Structures are given as structure tokens and as C-alpha cells.
Curated annotation (Swiss-Prot):
Its EC number is 5.1.1.3. The active site is at C74 (proton donor/acceptor), C185 (proton donor/acceptor). It comes from Lactiplantibacillus plantarum (strain ATCC BAA-793 / NCIMB 8826 / WCFS1) (Lactobacillus plantarum). This is Glutamate racemase. The gene is murI. Belongs to the aspartate/glutamate racemases family. Provides the (R)-glutamate required for cell wall biosynthesis.
Length: 273
């Protein structure tokens, strides 16, 4: 395997760019190939089997580009497809749930941990199981936040509407007295200032995607597949199954890249199922 090959990142939409942003900062010599399945989001309400199917379609697309590692930059897809992808693919596959769970336990002082995520991730109990396996004494309070992803995907995440929706959604969770809150969806860091404002300064927010890049770095070193050139060999590539201009508008702002460009692609035929 050529060390100069890209790392593949995949998500249901633009949320995975929160992971990419950290990767660009932490691993500047690594080439990024990213695909966001905006045509079929949100993944949260979908059955796990369907999410697995979509995940394999994205993985196949990236594998055809000879990536050296796959990062499932989506909590719902990690919960539904990580074991199957690891079994089927010949390259390292990294999800976002285990790194986020470890970071939450490390940050929590009173072992009262909140998890906010999509319906699919909450339904899977993936975070609860990961946290309690490591520390059975922990208390885990989970809440699905189905309105958050649409706010981000419609580029409304800094709006007054977003502020109101976040406050209303987290009203009950705030009463649960958690000291640490896992942002269990890679879209949610774009709402981080609003979430922090509602939960208060005493609650530590855990960005599971950002924590995942630490795992990516460790695996690159362990397997000796990090790019050892002084610069990237190949340019980064970004793909969306949705509208490229909408994807670009969010990405340019979030990544701070005014010349950011994305390409539209089609995957499968189940966009409206």
C-alpha cells in the first residue's frame, strides 16, 4: 500500500467535515477523500440495515480510489455498519463512537454523562454500551435530537431559529445534571456554541469526531502507513450525492477554504425510499 494514498471519510452529509477539519489541522500531509450522502439524509430515522447498505455504497466508491484507511465520520453509520465494514474491507476502518466514549469517561468528574445523537444512534445504544463496558458505574443519559441535522444541512446553524430549537430540545436534558455531554453526531459541533450556551459552562462537550482523529493518527503510525513525504501527493477531493453548491457553501465557511470545490455523484437508486 502506498503511504501517499488518501484517507477516505464518509458521512450522511456535511457533518463529517467536522472530522475532516480536525484531520486537516492534525494531519496536514495526509490527502482527504470525502463523500457526503446528502441525497439520502438524514440517516437517523432509517433502519440499520438500510444505513449499512448506504455505508457500503460509499465505502465501495472510496475503495475504488485506492484509499489506505476509511473513517466512518458518521455516528449513525458507525453504529450500524462498523463491524461489517471491518470484516469486509482490507484496510483499517475507524468509527467515531469508541473515541468519543473514551474521551467522555476521561473528562467526566462525576460519571454523569449525557449523549445527544440521531434516533438511529440512540436506538442502537452504541454509546451507552461503549461507556458502560469501560465503566459500569457511569450514568448515561441519552437523548435523540432529530431537528439538529436539518438545521446544519440547511445552513441555518447560526440562526435565531437554531438558537430556539437547541434551547427547546435540550431543556429536559439540562435538568439531568450531567457534567459531560457527548456530541454524538458529527453535524453537532457546528451547533457547539448554542449547545454550550444552553448546557452552561460547567458541562464539558465532547466532539467525538475530533477525538477520532487521534485514533487515525495512532493507527497511521502503528501500521507505518502515514505519508512520509513533506507535502500531500494528491489533492483533496470532496463528493456529495446532493447539491454541490449547497455543500460548498457550508464547507467554505466551516473549513475556511474560500476556493473549496465539491463534485456531485450518484450512489445507488434508493434516494427516496
Amino acid at each position: 500500500m502506498a503511504n501517499e494514498h488518501a484517507i477516505g471519510f464518509m458521512d450522511s452529509g456535511v457533518g463529517g467535515l467536522t472530522v475532516v477539519k480536525q484531520a486537516l489541522k492534525q494531519l496536514p500531509r495526509e490527502t482527504v477523500y470525502f463523500i457526503g450522502d446528502q441525497a439520502r439524509l438524514p440517516y437517523g430515522p432509517r433502519p440499520a440495515e438500510q444505513v449499512r447498505t448506504f455505508s457500503f455504497q460509499m465505502a465501495d466508491f472510496l475503495m475504488a480510489k485506492q484509499i489506505k484507511m476509511l473513517v466512518i465520520a458518521c455516528n449513525t453509520a458507525t453504529a450500524a455498519a462498523l463491524p461489517a465494514l471491518r470484516q469486509q474491507l482490507s484496510i483499517p476502518v475507524i468509527g467515531v463512537i469508541a473515541p468519543g466514549s473514551r474521551a467522555a469517561l476521561k473528562a467526566s468528574h462525576r460519571n454523569r454523562i449525557g449523549v445527544i445523537a440521531t434516533e438511529g444512534t440512540i436506538r442502537s445504544n452504541a454509546y451507552r454500551d461503549a461507556i458502560l463496558t469501560k465503566d459500569p458505574t457511569a450514568t448515561v443519559v441519552s437523548q435523540a435530537c432529530p431537528k439538529f441535522v436539518p438545521l446544519v444541512e440547511s445552513n441555518e446553524y447560526q440562526s435565531t431559529v437554531a438558537k430556539r430549537v437547541v434551547a427547546e430540545t435540550l431543556k429536559q436534558l439540562k435538568k439531568q445534571d450531567v457534567d459531560t455531554l457527548v456530541l454524538g453526531c458529527t453535524h453537532y459541533p457546528l451547533l457547539r456554541p448554542l449547545i454550550q450556551n444552553v448546557m452552561g459552562p460547567g458541562v464539558t462537550l465532547i466532539d467525538s469526531g475530533a477525538e477520532t482523529v487521534n485514533d487515525v493518527s495512532a493507527v497511521l503510525d502503528y501500521l507505518d502507513i502515514a505519508n512520509d513525504r513533506s507535502t500531500k501527493r494528491y489533492p483533496d477531493e470532496y463528493y456529495t450525492t446532493g447539491a454541490a453548491d449547497q455543500f460548498e457553501a457550508i464547507a467554505r465557511n466551516w473549513l475556511g477554504q474560500p476556493d473549496f470545490h465539491a463534485q456531485h455523484i450518484d450512489l445507488g437508486s434508493e434516494a427516496n425510499d
